[in-house]
Amino acid sequence: MSLLGSISLTSGRTLAVVAVLAVLSLLAGAFLLPRWTPRHFPRRTRHWLGRAVLILVPILLVTATGALILNRSLGLVKTSGDLAALIASNVDEPAAESGGEVTISDQPIASSSLDATFTRTEDGMLTTTWTGPISGITLPVFVIAPRDYSPTDGKTYAVIELLHGYPGEADGTTQGAHVQEALDNAIDAGIIPPTIIVVPSLSVDEEAHDCADIEDRPAVYTWSAHEIPAFVRHNFPNTSDKRDAWMLGGFSAGAYCAVWTAMRTPQTFGAAASLSGYDTQIEGQMTNLGDQYLADNTLSTMLAKRVPDGLRIYAMAAADDGAGGAPAAVKMAKAVKFPDTVTTDIPPTGGHAGPLWREHIPTMLAWWCSSDKVANALGSSPTAATARASEAYASIVPATNVTHTVRPTAPNGLVSLAVLALLSAAFVTLTWRFAGTWSAVLAGDADASASRSRFFRLPMPRVIAELPRPVASCVTYAARLACLSVVALACAAFIGVCANMAGGFYTSWSSVAESFMEGLR
């Protein structure tokens, strides 16, 4: 990977460098604005170009700073190379229909091929880079174990496998969702029995990841449904091999894959959790297998057609999720046949973002063990009563119908967009036409007459002109700096709202603020 392509977009150092550059661009811009006068640059083209640079550079750097902060909250894009690949994948021509889904027969896995050596990350997760013996996929795998875990502690552990979304990565998603904290708290409170969480990477290339084994593509289904469970049982031998002690969950695109995979692999998974998932796949190569394939692999259709075997599904999505997560949950609940069950959890707000998932990880854990199926599979003490009495379980908002609405003043609302557009236009105009005149000049100075030219309309106010020159210089510099700062912040917010409306992530300003605080940690 080239040097430019290897720049980390999640490190505090990168954020600090860009933030410092943004501040310096504001300071320099405020200093140079009055020096871009017609006297210095009488030709209009040079004057306009210089003034545009002084305004655009701070806007771009402040926007980049905000984007880096939000990206750090979930680690969605790791490096500049990943960002370039993500952009390229979204502008390329749509792929043609591929050869279709393939079935890889069960193959014996040699015990030695399951061996792994783990290291511990800064936040306490165990990690290794491992190669699936059947799929050939080589990717990082992260394991979150309880704080007192030991393979010789005499306990039998349940297992939760979590699948990240796209864009995104295993470690960033789990760190941003505070999964380790939620796991330890739930175990300490007796809400769930001892449990290990495994989070495999699904990023086999720069494309959106798949759920299925597709011809001429890496065998992601084999990796997540067969190899990862075998990997866990081998390296953590005190984990249960019983279906009811295993749950497969996911976020966004990973949520669709979690429910899809759990239905395809009933011998392994007795429960599934969908956090802001879809009913029909909208990403990856599965979308190129034809309309009939997509219809057959719609989750509500699969639930209606499958032979029910007691699969339990937790389907959470905010009612204002623009990606359709809430309608997907309701459709699954209406299609399910007993003894399969679907529990819907539809909070009124939350969008399709990290703060919502962070809030509902404890809810997912409480729901999972609100049935004693898990405890019975482990032979441990019952948890259902404790789980059902918990605040997390009480927060579930069941729904049978949902209506998607967008608040006009939300980060994805038209009023917010219009206000920021007007604010940006007003302050860009103010900075472009007037801020350059806010400087302390002596009577008869050539700049004084130039400041009254077509492009610099306002002379220095009398109240400032009467101040001592050093004080007046500081006051006018502060005014230019404030004006340019407002321009940069307003335009950055406008760009952010446009991107948010396209992506459908945030639906409340509080969730934006929460992600900012998370990204600054």
Walk through the language-model features, giving the residues of each.
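Non-catalytic cap/lid and distal C-terminal segments of serine-dependent acyl enzymes
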Residues: 1-448, 452-521
